[in-house]
Structure formats: C-alpha cells, structure tokens
Amino acid sequence: SIVHPEPGVWKWDRVEAFLNFSNANNIKMRVHGPIGPQSSTWAKTDSRTAEELSELYEDFLTELCKKINGNSNILWMDVVNETIDSNGNWTDKRNGTNQWENPWTQIGKNDDGIPLYIIKAFEIAQQHAPDISLIFNQHAGMQPAMWNKVKETILYLKNKGLRVDGLGWQGHLRDNVVLSLNQSKLNYLFSIIDWAHENDLDFHITEI
C-alpha cells in the first residue's frame, strides 16, 4: 500500500531506509507480508478488475524481489500473509475501502480452487528471489479448519514444483493479555510445528 499504491506510482524510500539500516548495522531482516490484506485504497476499490489487480501486484512483487534479492541481510520473505480465515475460508474481498480485506481473491481461482494470486506470488518469488527463504505466513489461533487449509495449500504448491521453505505463524502473544494457549492449544501448536518439520519446512513465529 506504500511502495506501489497504484499504477505508475512507486515509493521506495521506506524500503531503502530499512535496507540501508540493516546493512549499516549488520541486522538480519525478514520482508513481511508483501501480498495479503494490507493493501492500498486503490486495490480495495470495488470497481477494480481482475486484470488491473493482477498487473499491479505482479509488478510490485517482481520489483520488490529484484530489489531485496542478493542482500545478505535479507534472509526471509513472508510471500503471502493472512490468506485463510479462522473458519478455513479464503480471506476475501469486502465492500468499500476502509475494511480489513483481501482484494486479490478477485483475480480468481484455478480448477483446483486455489486462488491464482497465491500461486503466482510463489512463482514470482521463486524466480526473482532465489537467495531468500520463502515463507507461507498465517495469523489467528489454533483453529483446525484453518490450519488444515494452510497445510493443504502448502502441499499443493510444493507438489506443483514451487518452493515453499517455511511456515510462519503470527503468534501475537502480547504481555498485556492472558495467553490463550492452554495445554490443549499448545499441544496443537506443537503438532503444527512437527508437521512443518516432517514436510521439510522451517517453522517461524513471525509476530510475537
């Protein structure tokens, strides 16, 4: 929503500031959520066509990958973020421009029911960010319907020959609330971590 908010507009200042800071201080970084619900007002405008949305996000992700690839301090990228809701449905478009929504599902799904934007995002990242670990990042809690869909989608991508190096979870374990991960939920989290490792995936807690 900042770098490429609409066609013909590019604002790299913030990205370059982060890159310069990490390089000057030898700080390892991850690129978080380039494709997901955090989208520009232009992208969330209800009149957008699939073609317009495809062109915008493909241009953005391609140029972002080219800019960060080869930087020794950029180790990971959360290629897609918050793609599935807690009920196991694809995070979708909502009316208007002031809501938390994912406009990219309007691009469509393939014959297997997988959103095209997810597949294309990993294709672009695999081609243009070969030096970076590619992560499928997810939010919410320990809802089995959601995690089953996450697992199915990751395995689908891998079976299609796409590189998925890790699974990320936004833990949001804030110290100002009672942690909701009781023993049952902790055990479920452990099972997700085990599943990731069994399928040659790193497991990251990406937001503490």
Residue spans for each PLM region:
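Glycoside hydrolase catalytic-domain groove-lining segments
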Residues: 13-24, 103-137, 144-208
